[in-house]
Amino acid sequence: MKIHIKNGRLIDPKNGIDAVRDVFIAKGKIIAIGMPPDEFQASRIIDAQSFIVCPGLVDLSVRLREPGLEYKATLESEMGAAVAGGVTSFACPPDTDPPLDEPGLVEMLKHRAKNLNQAHVYPIGALTQGLRGERLTEMAELNDAGCIVFGQPDG
């Protein structure tokens, strides 16, 4: 699919751009900014006037309700809300209920997130079992399951 995003305020820190620009996308990749490539025919045109066009945002502390508190919110609803706000990746602290202190829980979370295919989820593993501050978790196993770092949130 070829997409033309027009009239949007492009903010691209990597390339030092903060200006109204058109963006041209083909096969999911940005192929041009400003002027269209030769023979570019968009199958979809998005008028982004009054909107910001930028790289995906990363939220470093998303308090997930899953596992354990799905009656409040599901991974799907929380990921949908994040993506609607421009967040494409997020880290989730271990203070869920139950805490992210078991490899099986982390694997389940990563598997569900991958199947939803909305945003990248980076679990933060519990530093101690049950977040009680007494015994360390099996950090190597948690890392193998997908934890990127470990933490001990204040209770």
Q: Model features per residue range: what roles?
A:
Residues 102-103, 108, 123, 129-136:
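Active-site-proximal beta-alpha core segment in soluble small-molecule metabolic enzymes
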Residues 8, 23, 28, 50, ...:
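Divalent metal-coordination and catalytic microenvironments
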Residues 37-53:
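Active-site metal-binding motif and surrounding structural segment of the metallo-beta-lactamase
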Residues 71-79, 131-141:
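Short, acidic/polar
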Residues 1-40:
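N-terminal metal-binding scaffold of metallo-dependent hydrolase/deaminase domains
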Residues 109-116, 139-144:
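Acidic (Asp/Glu)-rich catalytic clusters
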